[in-house]
Amino acid sequence: MSYQDLKECKIITAFITPFHEDGSINFDAIPALIEHLLDHHTDGILLAGTTAESPTLTHDEELELFAAVQKIVNGRVPLIAGVGTNDTRDSIEFVKEVAEFGGFAAGLAIVPYYNKPSQEGMYQHFKAIADASDLPIIIYNIPGRVVVELTPETMLRLADHPNIIGVKECTSLANMAYLIEHKPEEFLVYTGEDGDAFHAMNLGADGVISVASHTNGDEMHEMFIAIAESDVKKAAAIQRKFIPKVNALFSYPSPAPVKAVLNYMGFEAGPTRLPLVPAPEEDAKRIIKVVVDGDYEATKATVTGVLRPDY
């Protein structure tokens, strides 16, 4: 799978990591989850990202996860590996290892967290990673998690690097519009905000890297088809019903809500690993009613005001 395959992807699912109650990875649960995603319009899969609880995964666990999912997917959709850290040297070594591992269309590298680099520091960080191997790199810009924000101007400098092929943008629609207007033609722009997918696609984004596609992929697919057919009225109607579901899925630190819904649907998503904890039982029930049944009144007390998936 290559850049060209990624270019065809509209819905890339940021895959959860299923766990047993003891916290170990439930590898037996992965096949059913993958087939569910592929049956419901997932075009690509991101592994070891935020939704996978990557801060709690060991290096060996990530490699085991990569191997397991590659075997199941067997080339049916492109795979992206989460490869970034806040240590440039460590990120370079991981990118090289993933490139040698093979089977990935790209690596997703997050903006460095905690150490709060300058724009020039971030530029040098991503340039060094992209220079290190031939694995194409997608930048993950999410200031809600990492505190600092890669500006559109710095992003466009990086977009000129031949091995930096895109961005997962979680800042603002204004930034996204600017990037889409000024980027190189082949540079991919994805939103990482499920709630912004309607607006992002209308602005000309390439797709969404999504959590909600675990549970609501059909709705997203239908909305994207309506947008492609210039049926804005239909797409907007889908979006109005979709937004409360997104709010519910991010009413507690992700991926706790989506795991609760998947467990209810019969998939063995399992618990989260500490320091993340499940949503309280009554709130989880209300989240499920919204996401599965479209009962929008059920979670009003839980999700009112939660408009952005900063979790």
Swiss-Prot record:
Q: In which pathway does it act?
A: Amino-acid biosynthesis; L-lysine biosynthesis via DAP pathway; (S)-tetrahydrodipicolinate from L-aspartate: step 3/4
Protein residues bound to pyruvate: 51, 209
Q: EC top class, in one word?
A: lyase
Task: Give the domain of life.
Answer: Bacteria
Any one GO MF term held by the record is:
4-hydroxy-tetrahydrodipicolinate synthase activity
Q: What GO biological process terms does the UniProt entry carry, in alphabetical order?
A: diaminopimelate biosynthetic process; lysine biosynthetic process via diaminopimelate
Which residues does this entry assign to the site Part of a proton relay during catalysis? 50, 114
Which CDD domains does its entry note?
A: DHDPS
Residues the record marks as active site: 140, 168
**Any idea which UniProt keywords this protein has?**
Amino-acid biosynthesis, Cytoplasm, Diaminopimelate biosynthesis, Lyase, Lysine biosynthesis, Schiff base
Question: Where is this gene product found?
Answer: Cytoplasm
Q: Which GO terms describe its cellular component?
A: cytosol
PROSITE patterns, A to Z = DHDPS_2
Q: Name the Pfam families for this protein.
A: DHDPS (PF00701)
Catalytic activity from the UniProt record: L-aspartate 4-semialdehyde + pyruvate = (2S,4S)-4-hydroxy-2,3,4,5-tetrahydrodipicolinate + H2O + H(+)
**EC code(s) of this entry:** 4.3.3.7
- What family name appears in the similarity comment? Belongs to the DapA family.
The record describes the protein's role as:
Catalyzes the condensation of (S)-aspartate-beta-semialdehyde [(S)-ASA] and pyruvate to 4-hydroxy-tetrahydrodipicolinate (HTPA).
Q: How does it assemble?
A: Homotetramer; dimer of dimers.
NCBIfam families recorded: dapA
Query: Which PANTHER family does the record associate with it?
Result: 4-HYDROXY-2-OXOGLUTARATE ALDOLASE, MITOCHONDRIAL, DIHYDRODIPICOLINATE SYNTHASE
> Can you say what this protein is called?
4-hydroxy-tetrahydrodipicolinate synthase
Q: Which gene encodes it?
A: dapA
